[in-house]
Amino acid sequence: MSDIKTYNEETQELFLRFLLSDPDLFARCQNIVEPEYFNLKYRPAVELFKSHSEKHNAIPTPEQVSAVAGTVLEPIPNVTVDHHDWFLSEFETFCRHKALE
């Protein structure tokens, strides 16, 4: 099995939906989130996440992301601790991979 993963648009959108769904997850990841790690389509949303959290100490609402960044993201309902664990592991790997590109 290969250690190299591909992160398609669906995966990147899923990561953003997780971040939108749980402010605590975003707080834990905000120092490694960089817009350039994402496809061009999602960069305005990531920039908004970062700037909004710095200015307002909160993540933007789905409506704000849609209006300001032009990206429609739906929160993920019923996120569990197991989902958090998966997300944190996968997102850290994603950020490391993208930082080396």
What are these regions (language model features)?
Residues M1-C95:
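Noncatalytic partner-interaction/assembly domains of nucleic-acid and motor enzyme complexes
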